[in-house]
UniProtKB/Swiss-Prot annotation:
Listed InterPro entries: Endo-beta-glucanase, GH81_C, GH81_N
Activity as a function of temperature: Optimum temperature is 50 degrees Celsius.
Domain GH81 stretches: 31-759
Subcellular location: Secreted, Cell wall
GO function terms (MF aspect): endo-1,3(4)-beta-glucanase activity; glucan endo-1,3-beta-D-glucosidase activity
Full protein name: Glucan endo-1,3-beta-D-glucosidase 1
Any single GO BP term: cell wall organization
Length: 796
């Protein structure tokens, strides 16, 4: 393949100041989305603690906050057998693992994945694609011959959102070290050796070495030059290229079938890249002298309901444009004016193929931001359902709020608060919803405020603490007993160790936004400070915020959030996320808070993140038929289950039933999720292939989740089901019926489908409760008149 290296015409982004990796200003002040939400000191609301689990390998002199939920977080801590990976992609890196030979930085670049089967479990049938992982193998390790009997010291000397600089150094010798700039999408592993003798180790047999200058007399054991092409005996066969960029050529000796060792100490840069195919060798040669050292990110809105984010890569040199690998979602949204696409690809760890791009600045655009705000796009339910919905709302509002919202943990309490907040919202927006009962609307809002007040005062069963070490808000329960906790690191789903913050905070932020929207005067100052502290903890865009880390949960390169926080034994499969909708719920909540407070940059930023989340969800988490990023048998699962950087697992953390695996991807059902994120195409495929057969048999609250999701494509069938089935603890019957009845063509869908399938005589599959005729005078009677054949129907 012919390839011409070009210098992209870069659009310069002015940066006045930044938190490493996050630019604070774009070219137009009015368009900038990285604007402070607040500078309020959270210690005036939340008692402060210093987190008990400190990073072991962070440079404490640079003043930076150690990231807790980042792709680089494993670098800061020890792990079991030193096997916790760092995944810049397309390479996976492990430090000081015990897989034989001198310790160093191990490179893994698997072209094939390991698929594992699961036996039949509960209502989940046998699958030959229960999980997908990468085998742990030393493809190539960068080390030093001086480290044969010592373990090098390690330190992360600098970091930003897109990179970390790792130093391995000889103990008691600060002048002998290797610096590794580890950067997202890096096409090469870069190692800056200082006064150490390079050594390259592989668990595979090295079957050939080609040097660009000369070989030894016997043509077998010693090689000299600035470029070495190494071929392994793995399957499929791998070829790596080693580039020596120092002042003098490098001389390597093949010590045995697995080791290449330099003849003397070396000072200079060595770069290593996997060669996917012979035709890409000239491309790697042309880009070898320019490497990434980090990056800045900015985001801006435009005038056409769109927004974009820009990654400006930092490099060691402007000698040539940078070569970087991009994920699938980058390729579908990137502005090609600043980059050159190539045909060179490598497999990522779990996101499918990555494609190499040439260019120092990436601008990625989202042109269709969600139009959803507080209510469904068609906010009024079908008029024939209003009386029944109001009857159910009366029942739900008459329930015991304290029992549902004052539980022992914040997660389930937050779910309860949000479900009651949705009722207060639709009653108090009666001009749009047509659900008119002013007295009941006031009761709903008053009861919601009373239930929310203990959280606002931080007097709930598990109060929050402000952590001065990692600069965040944590639950007390998982802290040591000396700090008032239980010593149970898993308490609150690991919230005290920074797991699931966007899930937990999302429910509270949505609730707070609704209260402030309906009554802007209620505890206004404290509510604003409290809510914005929770937002800043998860999604802080302020470059100068001294109280919170930047973008704790959000990953601008991956295009989605990470849930997993600090893991004392290491995150052995990398970062993870299970519930996409609960991450959506947080960003929707941030969007609503922006609307409620008139903070347009926050609203647009959250809208951009929702759009990027939607894009990446259908690339990596939820799989439409024909998805190219996964093996076909994984695609047939329709959802990943638990997604890790190094593994996908068709299960959940809390059990293995189909309704669990798929249902956790459907809650909480909100207008944002129903109207924008979950598409009819995907819901139809998932229902036909996975859920339609089991939904009528589910006798747990998951049935309520499944049928409310089904309402996206078939509200007329879902509505009577939702009258009967159990509800999830974050779901009310009245709001479920309301959402269902707001779906476009609520009744006409049924009639059209019936006429289209007039040859069938099969009734819709609905859960039975023995009272099918209970509402004969209401919905069922009208439904049967519209659908006289009692036909099964599904709308696509």
């Amino acid at each position: 393949m012919r390839f011409q290296v070009i210098v992209a015409a870069a659009t310069i982004t002015m940066i006045t100041s930044y938190i490493p990796g996050v630019a604070s200003q774009s070219t137009s002040d009015g368009d900038d989305l990285f604007v402070p939400v607040s500078n309020f000191d959270p210690k005036s609301i939340f008692p402060e603690i210093k987190h008990p689990f400190e990073p072991m390998y962070a440079n404490t002199e640079n003043g930076k906050i150690v990231p807790t939920n980042s792709w680089i977080s494993n670098l800061f801590y020890p792990s079991a057998d030193n096997l916790a990976p760092t995944t810049p992609d397309p390479y996976t890196l492990r430090l000081l693992d015990g897989y034989g030979g001198n310790p160093g930085l191990t490179i893994r670049q698997p072209s094939a994945k390991v698929l594992g089967s699961y036996p039949p479990t509960n209502d989940v049938p046998y699958t030959d694609a229960g999980y997908m992982i990468n085998s742990v193998v030393v493809d190539l390790r960068l080390t030093s011959s001086e480290w044969s009997d010592v373990v090098p010291d390690r330190q992360v000397t600098d970091w930003d959102h897109l990179s970390a600089n790792l130093r391995l150094s000889t103990p008691q010798d600060s002048n002998s070290y290797i610096d590794f700039p580890i950067v997202r999408g890096m096409a090469y592993i870069t190692a800056n050796y200082n006064n150490l003798t390079p050594q390259f180790l592989s668990q595979h047999a090295i079957i050939s070495v080609e040097a660009d200058e000369k070989k030894s007399d016997d043509n077998t054991s010693t090689f000299s030059g600035r470029k070495f092409k190494i071929t392994m005996n793995d399957d499929p066969t791998s070829t790596f290229i080693i580039y020596s960029l120092g002042d003098k050529p490098l001389e390597l000796r093949k010590q045995d079938n697995s080791n290449l060792v330099a003849s003397k100490p070396y000072t200079g840069v060595i770069r290593v890249a996997k060669l996917p195919a012979p035709e890409f060798e000239t491309l790697l040669d042309a880009s070898r002298a320019v490497w990434p050292t980090g990056g800045d990110i900015s985001a801006r809105s435009d005038d056409n309901n769109g927004a974009s984010y820009t990654i400006k890569w930092k490099t060691n040199s402007n000698e040539a444009p940078l070569l970087t690998y991009a994920y699938a979602h980058h390729l579908t949204s990137i502005d090609d004016s600043n980059v050159k696409r190539t045909d060179m690809t490598l497999q990522s760890a779990t996101k499918g193929p990555m494609t190499a791009l040439v260019g120092n600045e990436w601008t990625l655009r989202e042109t269709e931001l969600s139009p959803v705000e507080w209510l469904p796009l068609q906010a009024a339910p079908n008029p024939t359902t209003i009386n029944e919905i109001m009857t159910e709302i009366n029942k739900d509002i008459a329930s015991n709020y304290t029992q549902e919202t004052a539980k022992e943990d914040n997660y389930f309490s937050g779910k309860g608060l949000q479900k009651f907040a949705m009722l207060a919202l639709i009653l108090n927006k009666s001009d749009q919803t047509q659900l008119r009962n002013p007295e009941l609307a006031q009761i709903a809002l008053d009861k919601l405020k009373a239930a929310f007040l203990p959280y606002l005062q931080n007097e709930q069963a598990d109060p929050f603490r402000y952590d001065t070490l990692y600069k965040g808000i944590v639950a007390k329960a998982g802290l040591p007993t000396s700090m008032g906790g239980t010593d149970d690191l898993s308490a609150e789903f690991g919230h005290s160790y920074y797991s699931d913050h966007h899930y937990h905070q999302g429910y509270f932020v949505v609730t707070a936004a609704i209260i402030h929207h309906l009554d802007p005067t209620w505890n206004a100052d404290r509510l604003k400070a409290w809510t914005e502290a929770l937002i800043r903890d998860v999604n802080n865009a302020n470059d100068g915020d001294e109280y919170f880390a930047a973008f704790r949960n959000w990953d601008w390169f991956a295009g989605h959030s990470w849930a997993g926080g600090i893991k004392p034994d290491g995150a052995l499969d990398g970062r993870d996320q299970e519930s996409v909708p609960e991450s959506v719920n947080f960003y929707w909540g941030a969007k609503l808070w922006g609307l409620a407070t008139g903070n347009t940059p926050l609203t647009k930023l959250a809208s951009l993140q929702l759009a990027v989340t939607k894009r990446t969800t259908y690339e990596y988490f939820w799989m439409l038929d024909g998805n190219k990023n996964r093996p076909e048998n994984i695609v047939r699962n329709k959802v990943i289950g638990i997604y890790f950087e190094q593994k996908t697992d068709y299960t959940t953390y809390f059990g293995r039933f189909l309704e669990y695996i798929h249902g956790i991807q459907q809650l909480p059902m909100t207008p944002e999720l129903m109207e924008y994120i979950r598409t009819p195409e995907f819901v139809s495929q998932e229902w036909d292939e996975k859920l339609g057969a089991i939904a009528p048999t589910v006798q747990s609250p998951w049935a309520g989740v499944l049928y409310l999701n089904y309402a996206i494509i078939n509200p007329a069938e879902a509505y009577p089901a939702l009258r009967k089935v159990q509800m999830d603890d974050g779901q009310t019957r009245s709001y479920s019926l309301y959402l269902t009845a707001t779906r476009p063509h609520f009744f006409r869908r049924s009639l059209l489908a019936a006429l289209a399938r007039h040859g069938s005589t099969r009734r819709p599959s609905l859960p039975s409760s023995g009272d099918d005729d209970k509402h004969e005078d209401g919905f069922l009677l009208r439904f049967r008149r519209l659908n006289p054949f009692n036909l099964k129907h599904r709308i696509y």
